[in-house]
């Protein structure tokens, strides 16, 4: 090596964490989450994951409620999870307005999840652009407990925390993760098609596939999201534009009238939500498992 030269290795740049879980914990502190759990049986895998999630939310300072119910009619099972009563009419509120909550977390009985996936939903619902952090400071004190001042007589301070302010106009009231269906290729989120494309697509919606969704890097809007792993902010079901029954199956009739399709209960909800002005956001990074039984 020539004289006068010295080789210095450059320290590798530190990778910024993909998710700020400490922020997510701060966002749920003092908030109430109600688990909406349709179905009548779960696996031990589900049970262990659910107990851990409950523990972690409480440890982070959040509150939890469980609303579980069952009906052979899935649309009615979901309504029952919201405490619906057919005698209260179309303008009724979830749980008759008597249950305080900030978010509903819908989890189907065959979903495999963990606490990280929940925090990721929170960070999708309250994105970075909706958050303003304000530093909280306090004077630095000497060994005798006396506040230290600088040469101008001003207190020397240190940052001890942050106050978080949220711009509600930038919050996403309906957010979802995704999971594969039984074919192992089709996902639980989809986009609507016009009649011609719907027909050429074999009479099914334009579902994101395992290949297409893994090419996405940022949250995106969808026309439909399955309710297996879905977070809904308070105010959506309370909206006067979202009357009961919230999951009533619909007949989707295309323009010509020659093609029509019966929608499932979750598709019907998404149709109503979009008509009421809500966007449905999916983050392609939030993938949960989907437990299915296979005979071999």
Label for each model-derived stretch:
Residues 92-114:
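Short beta-strand-to-loop acidic/aromatic patch adjacent to the donor-nucleotide binding site
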Residues 49-52, 80, 120-121, 268:
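Alpha-helical elements of Rossmann-like donor-binding domains used by nucleotide-donor carbohydrate transfer enzymes
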